[in-house]
Every structure is written in C-alpha cells, then in structure tokens.
Amino acid sequence: MDKANTNRSKKEVCGGSGEAKPTGKKRKNERTLTNKNVNAKKSMMDFKALTRHNPSDDMTGAYNFLHEYISVDVYSYEFVEKMKSLKKKLIEKMGINAKDLSSSIGSELLKLIWRYDVKSVVEYNLLKIEQANFTSHPQISFNNSEPKKTNL
C-alpha cells in the first residue's frame, strides 16, 4: 500500500527552505484497509447473497468465488491466512470501538465471515487480556469458554 508523505510541512509547500523529514506518525485520515481487502469483503457478502452459504462453512467454494475478485494468483492456504488476518484486524478494530457492537457493520461482517457474535468475541479477548495480567496470581481462576457461534 502506498503511503503519502505524512510530514509535509508548510515551509515546503510555500517555498520555504529545508526538507521535510517523515516522522513515522500516522495521519488521522490514513487508510487501514487496502482495496484488495475491501474487494475481498465485498465479494464475501456477494458469495453469501448468491449461494446462500456462509463463507466459513464452504471455504473451498468461497475461495473459488473470491479468486475472480482478487487480481493475484494465490493458493488456498494463503487465502485462509489472509482471511484470518482480516478477522484479526476486524476484532481489534471492534475491541477499540466497543460501544454498541451488535449494530455495527463490522459486527455483521464478522458474523458473516466467521459466525461469531462480536460481543462474545470481544468479551473473550478481554478475558484473555485479564488472564495475562493476573498470571502471577494462581489462586484466581477464569472461565475459559470459547466465544459463542451464531446460527445464520
């Protein structure tokens, strides 16, 4: 993904002396998803609409369907890894914006792709974080139940 110069100073634009040096800071409006990621998500929704099958149930069919949307040749294991990374990005984003999870578009995408209820996934991840923070206290125990799957 091409990134624009994130530290373009007014001096450089107005003809001032000196060269702007990148600071490595992210701009507020910087994109987090590439066009390939967006196309893959759109094609998953199209797959669900056309075949009435969940992409997570029919991974081979989803791969064959999505293969036409993706411009590069990939193997099925690479496709599965890409879907896992998209899932991780989506869960992380939903964890940050934890207000009213069930009505968001990200929640619907997560249910469509992985059949997990977003609220239970976020609760599960928060539980894992709590477990990591309290590993020095063996007397504290947590319920290690997996997130709930939704029936679509």
From Swiss-Prot:
Q: List the disulfide bonds.
A: none
Q: Identify the InterPro entries for this entry.
A: GeBP-like_DBD (IPR053932)
Record's keyword annotation contains Repeat? no
* Keyword Transcription regulation attributed: yes
Region called Disordered, residue ranges: 1-35
Bias-annotated ranges (Basic and acidic residues):
1-13
Q: Which UniProt keywords apply?
A: Transcription, Transcription regulation
The similarity annotation says: Belongs to the GeBP family.
Please identify the protein, giving its name as recorded.
Probable transcription factor At5g41765
Taxonomic lineage from the root: Eukaryota, Viridiplantae, Streptophyta, Embryophyta, Tracheophyta
